[in-house]
């Protein structure tokens, strides 16, 4: 492994991490996890069943989040049973790797993020079933001592995904209001779906388990698109948020440079007092 690019030495107000699945695509996943660890970041994963868990465990990485299921859906009884069984498997893997949070979506995602079960209209009955399913997830999480998150998505990249909007995710998580279920606030998806990012951070703040970021358009690292991440980082500090911020983005060019850009964007300069 070559020496890692130097990282920003300033104190970091957030718990920074990056998704290993999207960086250094020509390298094995355990190499990517080790690289992020060397750079002082936590490591996010997607579907754990495609990786060698022994190698990942041997890295000594701080794994921050991974998919909390491989099968299942929120909004129907059959899908809920599948989801709960799959979540149980994910919990065992998460404990083995020491993963902090297990992530859920409104339904399973297939190739290129296309929902396996698409719904143009979400009925009241589906809302009630989703809330019941998530409460059962919380019961499981409480027994096992783990935390799940529910992530918002955008309908352009994930057409027909139920409970995908930022508002839908916040409504479900806040109405359940249990510590075993938090919001995974993905600002890339919020920017496409709703915009108004700082206000959404404020609304979601009491229930945020993690904030994920990528710039838009392109889903590359901060600084490659239209989102003002420096302003968002400053606003989060002002709100008192000091929790996890994960880059779930592709590198527009060099992956080391992408990580450095992310760290810089979420390491705000200290405030200067004026006499």
Per-region residue spans from a language model:
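Histidine-acidic metal/acid-base catalytic patches
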Residues: 1-39, 98-100, 109, 135, ...
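Active-site acidic/histidine proton-transfer and metal-coordination neighborhood
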Residues: 3-10, 76-182, 192, 272-274
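N-terminal substrate-binding region of glycoside hydrolase catalytic domains
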Residues: 17, 30-47, 62-78
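Short, flexible active-site-adjacent loop segments at beta-strand->alpha-helix junctions, enriched
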Residues: 22, 49, 62, 67-70, ...
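Anion (oxyanion) recognition and catalysis
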Residues: 37, 57, 95, 138, ...
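Residue-level detector of anion-binding/catalytic polar loops
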Residues: 42, 62, 100, 147, ...
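Conserved beta-strand positions in the central sheet of alpha/beta enzyme cores
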Residues: 44-47, 64-67, 103, 149, ...
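Active-site-adjacent beta->alpha loops and helix N-cap segments on the catalytic face
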Residues: 49-58
